[in-house]
Amino acid sequence: LDEVLKIYSGGLGVLAGDYLKEASDSNADLCAIGFLYRYGYFTQTLSMDGQQIANYEAQNFGQLPIDRVLDEKGEQMVVDVPYLDYYVHAYVWRVNVGRISLYLLDTDNEMNSEFDRSITHQLYGGDWENRLKQEILLGIGGILTLKKLGIKKDIYHCNEGHAALINVQRICDYVAEGLTYDQAIELVRASSLYTVHTPVPAGHDYFDEGLFGKYMGGYPSRMGISWDDLMDLGRNNPGDKGERFCMSVFACNTSQEVNGVSWLHGKVSQEMFASIWKGYFPEESHVGYVTNGVHFPTWSATEWKHLYAAHFDENFLYDQSNPKIWEAIYNVSDEEIWKTRMVMKNKLIDYVRKQYRETWLKNQGDPSRIVSLLDKINPNALLIGFGRRFATYKRAHLLFTDLDRLAKIVNNPDYPVQFLFTGKAHPHDGAGQGLIKRIIEISRRPEFLGKIIFLENYDMQLARRLVSGVDIW
């Protein structure tokens, strides 16, 4: 949504925020559930040798654009979520995203134990047990929150496997109303949509049966099934006692529609989930795709908005996906487009120079190195941006597999090229942090100084500067 709300880490959170903004613009009947993290994702700084340093800064909720949700007594609403043999108590907050309400759960309160207060401390924080507790709060607690608010929707969207347990609670609710399990799961499937974002098995959450049973052991009886039946809903191979419970498999088994986030990712997802539906070819499954989009007003620079307003149809903002409207770009002169392009590029380069000066002052680095680096940043070079989480499967290192060839490319006197890198590695991901350190080490070599640049603390503000200023993203 915005960098002031530290409730996201990468593209998944940014995309979810854009969903809500676009839904508001379209006046869709939609609401959303998430977490109000006390610390959010970390602030990244880099040591002199390129080592990532993760800093966690507590958010002051009183200074954020959020409202307390009040109950009928005028007190802050509390949702009680069953865990094992006790309850976790979550405050409910609301963010008004235009016309859309985003409800955020917060367990950092005195009603909970120290361990349960930390459930909503950090995004992707803690061990696998804390991860499971987070997913129970999001899924089961999310549905309980909607019930307490009196909100009932026709379609429930599970955005990644983290929220898959919404369908456990929904089945429990239908069974409590008198339906059989078979009737309940059909109703749940018919009204559930699951979006998968990751292209690799390592990106899905798997939980050992012992840990999963520690917190979920009481739910099968409420669903009208056995424990083994519940476990099998999360297994590629039902009946395999050695297989762990996968949230993504459970989401596939309890959703009528499953989609990837691009045409190619849809195909990859069909192959990835093919083993769930035995006897069917991958292309026969109900896994499709919906290509990721962005909220145009959020990511379009002011300079480009002025150009569109001057040359495009007055209804442009209300029909951005209409290809006919975009044909007006051919009526804009090359000079005007290039002038706008260079204004944005120079803004980005000025920002990069400012950031490097501040980093040098902070780290008390070699002044000759920073002067040399700033001198070598060339506004006329082709500027390529790379910004994403530094997980190893995202392959940030591919550019550096042939350094001699890369040196020739970036130092070509006629067609110079520069690369801007930015991104955070998970604090527990040593390999991802190693990639960052390796890129910084390479960027300090004489042949790459000012040609390979790494910017610290990737967030939405930096992302907006990059996407508007680079030549290739």
Question: What are these regions, as identified by a protein language model?
Answer:
Residues L1-W473:
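Catalytic cores of carbohydrate-active enzymes across secretory and cytosolic contexts
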